[in-house]
Amino acid sequence: MSSTGSKKNKTKNNWKGLLIWILIALLLRWQVVEPRWIPSGSMIPTLQIQDRILIEKITPRINQKFNKHPRLNTVVIFKPPKILTEVGYSDGSALIKRVVGLPGDRIEVTDGKLYRNGKEIYEPWIKEPLGYEMGEIYVPEYSLWVLGDNRNNSLDSHIWGALPEKNLIGTALARYWPLKKIGPIRFP
């Protein structure tokens, strides 16, 4: 009889342990790190279509709490701004772009080059000149200017305007697929 009771307790403890691990994994995914995949070519050459990445979700919340902003050139994942949800984007979808402007910055595109506060921005990840012009834009308070690395084929701030910082979900941390490209996503 005691061996049956012992087996039941052991089985019960195993289930409790498994449940605890599942809850920890869900909590980590919900609050700390989340896997995502790249659905479009807007971040080529940095990220390719179908790449799998991990995003870190704590920093944007800490930044907002202490009224800080992401670093320039950080690759961020965010909920679509209102203008995109009004034309059919789901509130549950996510976009990925690079931060090129912070609140108070003046952003401009002239002769295929991006300028921030009157200075040309050096961007070694951009493979071709920008195929559009954009007069000087002032980035509003609590907003960011975000652009895809594939600037001529990206639905980004140059089309829909500044991104509210409250829309940030996380920052790109590392690529885990394909295996030959596994590693951190670096920012100069």
Regions found by a protein language model. Name each.
Residues 59, 158-160, 170-188:
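Extracytoplasmic/periplasmic terminal helices and flexible tails
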Residues 148:
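Phosphate/adenylate-binding glycine loop and adjacent helical scaffold
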Residues 12-15, 21, 25-138:
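Feature for secretory/organellar precursors and membrane-associated catalytic proteins
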Residues 62, 153-154:
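Active-site environment of divalent metal-dependent phosphoester hydrolases
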Residues 1-11:
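N-terminal Lys/Arg-rich, disordered targeting/topogenic segments
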Residues 145:
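PRPP/pyrophosphate-binding module of the type I phosphoribosyltransferase fold
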